[in-house]
């Protein structure tokens, strides 16, 4: 398995370029402090926020495999006691000779239509701590997608897996996932646009 593609799940867990603006991964920053990694990514996607949100929340029936082949399982579990949705993902990846299957069970909160928050349940995951936020803001004919994550794995990582190595790796592998998210969002939006066009045509008769 390619290390550059497989390392992404360690941090990210967590994208038909047929429009004027293709997906544009503007920036990725990775830092580490006291064993905890911090990731910030800034992207433009040529699709509306509601379509991107639909893709990001579509965990059922292992459908996260559509975003990246590193996802082996994904789905919704029974909700938490307060009714908050809980999702499960499992990814497989290798860092050179170091290979693992990584589980994450997370609470998913749609705080606003354009803000998704997640928080890992450590006793059911391979991470001591992990929280993330997806900010989806309208921008031009598409969406500015800002992603932040703080993560502390509960397993040993080789010493060479530092911020510089992870940033280089993510810059190599992340654009494909970003392009796929954009493509899936455009596909989800297309039936709506076609339906609206059909209605408009009917009204002019």
Q: Which residues does each predicted region cover?
A:
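N-terminal secretory signal peptides that target proteins for export/translocation
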Residues: 1-3
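Bacterial N-terminal signal peptides
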Residues: 8-17
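Hydrophobic ligand-binding cavity/cleft-lining segments
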Residues: 18-84
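Glycine-rich portal/gate segments that line the openings of hydrophobic small-molecule binding cavities
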Residues: 32, 36, 44, 74-124, ...
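Sec/Tat-exported extracytoplasmic proteins
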Residues: 47-49, 56-63, 91, 169, ...
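Extracytoplasmic/secreted envelope proteins and their assembly/folding machinery
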Residues: 49-57, 133, 174-178
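Hydrophobic pocket/interface hotspot
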Residues: 52-56, 62, 108, 118, ...
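Beta-strand/loop substructures that line and gate deep hydrophobic ligand-binding cavities in soluble
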Residues: 120-172
């Amino acid at each position: 398995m390619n290390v550059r593609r497989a390392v992404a799940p360690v941090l990210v867990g967590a994208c038909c370029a047929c429009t004027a603006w293709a997906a544009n991964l503007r920036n990725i920053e990775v830092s580490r402090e006291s064993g905890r990694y911090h990731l910030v990514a800034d992207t433009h996607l040529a699709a509306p926020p509601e379509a991107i949100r639909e893709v990001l929340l579509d965990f059922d029936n292992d459908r996260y495999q559509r975003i990246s082949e590193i996802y082996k399982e994904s789905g919704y579990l029974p909700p938490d006691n307060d009714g908050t949705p809980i999702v499960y993902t499992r990814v497989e990846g290798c860092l050179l000779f170091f290979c693992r299957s990584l589980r994450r069970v997370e609470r998913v909160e749609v705080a606003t239509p354009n803000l998704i928050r997640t928080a890992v349940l450590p006793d059911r995951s391979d991470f001591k701590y992990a929280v993330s936020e997806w900010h989806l803001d309208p921008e031009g004919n598409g969406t500015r997608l800002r992603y932040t994550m703080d993560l502390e794995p509960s397993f040993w990582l080789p010493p060479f897996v530092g911020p510089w190595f992870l940033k280089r790796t993510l810059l190599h592998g992340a654009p494909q996932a970003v392009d796929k998210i954009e493509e899936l969002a455009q596909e989800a939006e297309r039936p709506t646009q076609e339906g609206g066009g059909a209605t408009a045509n009917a009204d002019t008769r």
